[in-house]
Amino acid sequence: MIILWSLIVHLQLTCLHLILQTPNLEALDALEIINYQTTKYTIPEVWKEQPVATIGEDVDDQDTEDEESYLKFGDDAEVRTSVSEGLHEGAFCRRSFDGRSGYCILAYQCLHVIREYRVHGTRIDICTHRNNVPVICCPLADKHVLAQRISATKCQEYNAAARRLHLTDTGRTFSGKQCVPSVPLIVGGTPTRHGLFPHMAALGWTQGSGSKDQDIKWGCGGALVSELYVLTAAHCATSGSKPPDMVRLGARQLNETSATQQDIKILIIVLHPKYRSSAYYHDIALLKLTRRVKFSEQVRPACLWQLPELQIPTVVAAGWGRTEFLGAKSNALRQVDLDVVPQMTCKQIYRKERRLPRGIIEGQFCAGYLPGGRDTCQGDSGGPIHALLPEYNCVAFVVGITSFGKFCAAPNAPGVYTRLYSYLDWIEKIAFKQH
């Protein structure tokens, strides 16, 4: 057994050593695109056009001037690795030695980890292999990650812009690294922290003349994903007597006006082509606004989750929905922590749901608190549910859209959410088509 294990480790180190010694990135990229046809995790065309993308902050010239040198070690180098069991390419991961969260990508797509090894001897965590190429755990906050899709690149742009915003009322620059607690949706929830959800949108239905704020009825939620588009649930546009016609951004109190809020009319509603109002499937839509949003500290687009699976224990929902079943709606934006329910449990709970003839599908997931007491509720539909990662103190990644549930916060009745990753290609084709 010891001999076999030694042989396995030797082969892994040999593979990693070979790939890190390979200077021909173009040849590797060609192999990358061809072989991704046989994997669950796919690389879009935009990855071919961006040889190096940055996460979080600008990369200075010193960090990028010699990328090929980070692809190889010295001839006598011994690569320190650890093997993670059961992780596939594209999976969420945590490094064994420091607990940093990341995702599993090919070794040559995470140059910063390679440089860390060469300079500091930092351990490399191997998730799996593809065609003898090591797939390693690459921290989400690393600056050197090759080939990102457009929504990931836009996330970086939006947050870099937010850090550079000059707040004229205070004369300082917004760092984006700390969220300021707010004052005291969601059943069992708490008020949101200021700056944590600048992408939150409230959908409105104009009543009468619509000349006054009282003439707008606020219902569903949504998430700003670009300068012109808001993401929401398809049923929010089809379940009433008329569709929503207004979006409010930058508001934390719906019953109060503020200098930060922006009210913008809806120009076009784009339902997912497979959505049918008679079923709960493909419950997702994009709202095109009549004008571009003005970005500020309080208003900027969301970051969209880039991985096929969540593999995180909890998510955070936000909205202005009811604070109890059939109770009054909340005027204050609130948030609640929810447990991600195992997919098999989710399928079992909703196996007899009339509007789910095929049961829970891959494009859906459940979240809640099975003992009861915490949940999204009426009025939260269409609002985003988020992953909060320690590396990004003030950035919430949208992982899903609130779709439906049995009751609010009842035991063994988690809410059902549209899984964002399943529709990421569709979102990008519409919201970022000018790019």
Curated annotation (Swiss-Prot):
A cellular-component GO term for this protein: extracellular region
Keyword Transcription set for record: no
InterPro entries linked: CLIP, CLIP_Serine_Protease, Peptidase_S1_PA, Peptidase_S1_PA_chymotrypsin, Peptidase_S1A, Trypsin_dom, TRYPSIN_HIS, TRYPSIN_SER
Extent of the signal sequence: 1-27
Disulphide-bonded residues: C93-C137, C104-C127, C110-C138, C179-C303, C220-C236, C346-C366, C377-C408
Keyword Hydrolase among record annotations: yes
Active site per UniProt: H235, D283, S381
Alphabetically ordered keywords of this record: Developmental protein, Disulfide bond, Glycoprotein, Hydrolase, Protease, Secreted, Serine protease, Signal, Zymogen
Gene3D superfamilies registered for this protein in UniProt: Trypsin-like serine proteases
GO molecular function terms attached to this record: serine-type endopeptidase activity
Domain note: The clip domain consists of 35-55 residues which are 'knitted' together usually by 3 conserved disulfide bonds forming a clip-like compact structure.
Subunit text: Interacts (via N-terminal prodomain) with ea/easter (via Peptidase domain); leads to proteolytic activation of ea by snk. This interaction does not require sulfation of a vitelline membrane component by pip but proteolytic cleavage of ea by snk does.
Protein's name in the database: Serine protease snk
Lineage: Eukaryota, Metazoa, Ecdysozoa, Arthropoda, Hexapoda
